[in-house]
Design a protein with these regions (language model features):
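Short beta-rich binding modules
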Residues: 1-120
């Protein structure tokens, strides 16, 4: 897979019910927050990556959860944070306070099955 460079132009945290009237069936009870990262490649092509998690009151999240599907979603977020060097300790990283620092950070994108994704 060929990796291309892109730059994060927007990163926001939403509550699930800010985006949907009913929680999508694929989400578990403890998937309460959504992080949407928008990156732009050369030529203006925009790529969106979505991360589901459950933020604690202090803005951090836990990798451990009773549900394996929710845990794998959180692992994806943790890999993103460590791969792009936002933090070495994802569970101690305050997403609420630090998400604004993601803007203009360079990321890699890959094309798979006709879709572009942020490489993690």
């Amino acid at each position: 897979m060929e990796k291309k460079n892109a730059v994060i132009v927007e990163a926001k945290i939403y509550k699930v019910f800010d985006l949907w009237k009913r929680k999508p069936k694929c989400l578990t009870f403890n998937d309460t927050d959504v992080i949407i990262v928008t990156a732009e490649a050369k030529g203006g092509e925009k790529i969106r990556e979505t991360f589901f998690t459950c933020l604690k009151a202090d803005g951090t999240f836990s990798l451990k959860t009773p549900n394996q599907i929710a845990e794998s979603r959180r692992q994806k977020l943790a890999k993103f944070l460590t791969y792009y060097k936002f933090t070495d300790s994802p569970e101690d990283y305050n997403l609420v306070n630090n998400i604004s620092k993601w803007k203009n950070k360079e990321v890699k994108i890959v094309r798979d099955k006709g879709e572009n994704y942020i490489f993690i």
